[in-house]
Amino acid sequence: MSAIRTYNVEAGLPVLDEARRLVIAEIKEAKRTGAKVLKVIHGYGSSGKGGALCVGLRKSFGLRKKEGVIKDFIAGESFSIFNPTVLAMLEAVPQLRGDPDLNATNEGVSILWLK
């Protein structure tokens, strides 16, 4: 069991609704296996302002947080030691300190803190 699980939803080139379903299933699987963090690779899109997956999935993550499915989520560009939520995540899941996207401002990922 690893505390951190990575899921590349972008790889299959799904439409947004399919990507939402895939990520929800992956959240359930990550929780079942005891992961504390799910790193979702959704890409940023080529428009320069965030593609459908990036924007749509992040809205979905906000809803999952409100529903209590996840504790919180961090957009990749905010995944920094200067973010108080990230500091709390690092304290709870110290393995995250070695993640290559920490402090990298990667807009193509989101970090989900699982309950």
Describe each model-derived feature in a short phrase.
Residues 1-115:
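Long, charged, low-complexity intrinsically disordered regions
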